[in-house]
Amino acid sequence: VASPSFQERRGVWLTNVASAVLFVPGSSQRAIKQLAEHHFNTVYPVVWNRGYTFYPSALAKEMIGKPQEPFINWTRGNVDILKVIIEESHQRGLEVLPWFEYGLMIPRSSLLAQKHPDWLTESKEGSANTFFQDELEAKNEKNNGNLIQRWRKSAYERQVSQLAWLNPLHPEVQQLIKGLMLEVVMNYPVDGVQLDDHFGMPVELGYDPLTVKIYQQEHRGKSPPKDTHNGEWMRWRAAKMTAFMTDLVKTIKTINPDIIVSLSPNSHPFSYQNYLQDWKTWVRRGLIDELVLQVYRNDLNSFNRELHQSAVKLARKKIPVSIRILSGTLNNTVKIEQIKEQVETVRKQGFDGVSFFYWESLWGYLTPESPYKRRRIFDELFSK
């Protein structure tokens, strides 16, 4: 099992959503310079999002029809942004773990979905559309909130109702995901690769013809239960996801055994019940080198409870476990005092580090306090 080469993981995600860091010339270099100055040591740059790559990919050109995301192509021309990020980061002592953010999720309208509709898994109603929701949205849903919050929620639902899911049992889907990850591992001097909560299968899916056929072959002709939460049906699909993960990791490690395979999931009960992502089994089987657990909570007691879950305790006995903290989003700003409190809580519990989602909300202008104040607090936290 590969392991991070330093004591405390201090990471941040670089994304293409509500952020200019990948698109504006000089932005990624400036971001990495500032991160190094504030004692960060890891970046997770997005390389797979909405059915496109964020590096020039021969495989994407062949299988999707575009070598990389069109807007980055338009804004940066021939610049390989992943290469730039790796060179700048390594020069300043930061590790780089490219982040395959969207995993198996793609927009219904994407080139990939249009070109290969048979690669998509379906609900029992025969729809390829799905609804992605993480724990943060699930908790916010319990409180309807004010008019603005309800408007944001309906806008979000309109957007995500257009999502589809690649079938993890489809050989060509496996070939695509594996091929993209191998392309990055073989062509760039990366320190690792990262998957997150999108690398699973929504529990309402799995009723496409291919999955049904495989299930019938293994169940003497019997069709999958109509109850999406049937225990055996959930275990069967989760086991198929685990088999895919096993093959993926084995292939990556054959190419480079030192590559860190990082996973940034939601809590285990949520991941398994909603996305059939049985990461506790993945940890037990040695498939993950690093766990970066998403704990997006405003309430400190609730935050603390997540750190003490049984799956987290199991993982800590086997691999480095750090905590993914929300530093804010466009619609959900987070005060620096809350961030500080959460970092101190994580440290008190003896975890292996913290990482923040995402770059623009660390100390940019999407924040409740001045960038100067936020940078000063991060300096105090990380200069020790």
Language-model segment annotations:
Residues 6-15, 19-22, 26, 98, ...:
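Active-site-adjacent "subsite" loops/lids of carbohydrate-active enzymes
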Residues 20-38, 65-92, 175-179, 239-246:
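Aromatic- and glycine-enriched glycan-recognition loops and surfaces
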Residues 26-53, 187-192, 287-291, 348-354:
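Catalytic domains of carbohydrate-active enzymes, especially glycoside hydrolases
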Residues 40-77:
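Aromatic-lined carbohydrate-binding/catalytic grooves of carbohydrate-active enzymes
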Residues 288-303, 310, 317-384:
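Substrate-binding cleft of secreted/luminal carbohydrate-active enzymes
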Residues 204-206, 210-332:
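Glycoside hydrolase catalytic-domain groove-lining segments
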Residues 20-37, 173-184, 271-285, 334-347:
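Short, acidic/polar
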Residues 19-26, 46-53, 75-79, 201, ...:
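Acidic-and-aromatic substrate-binding clefts and catalytic sites of carbohydrate-active enzymes
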